[in-house]
Amino acid sequence: MSEAVVAIHFKDMSVDETVRDLVERRCADLADEFPELTHLDVTLAPDGSGHHASVHGTGKRTEVASHAQAPALGHAADLVLDQVRHQLRKVHDKHIYTQRRRAKHRAELAR
């Protein structure tokens, strides 16, 4: 399991333990899938017509942020964590494939 620090904030609302557990589990899955991740900060808040969720994640050569809105708090949290997973996948693949392209280029130059 990764050592990523997860901070979950409920802004201007009472804590919903069901949503907290869902977010903690999803963040732990993200941290396991992307070991370069060191910190995830999740903020959940009501807005005029539903709920707002935002996430900021940092790590080694990685920084992502996203936000989402939905009528239900759990749905907003799911949406924003799906967006962050997509962003982390793009960053992760970019780092891996950049290194592979460099190695391939160096091997071709060495011939």
Where are the regions that the model predicts?
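N-terminal, polar/charged subdomain of small-to-medium soluble alpha/beta proteins
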Residues: 1-111
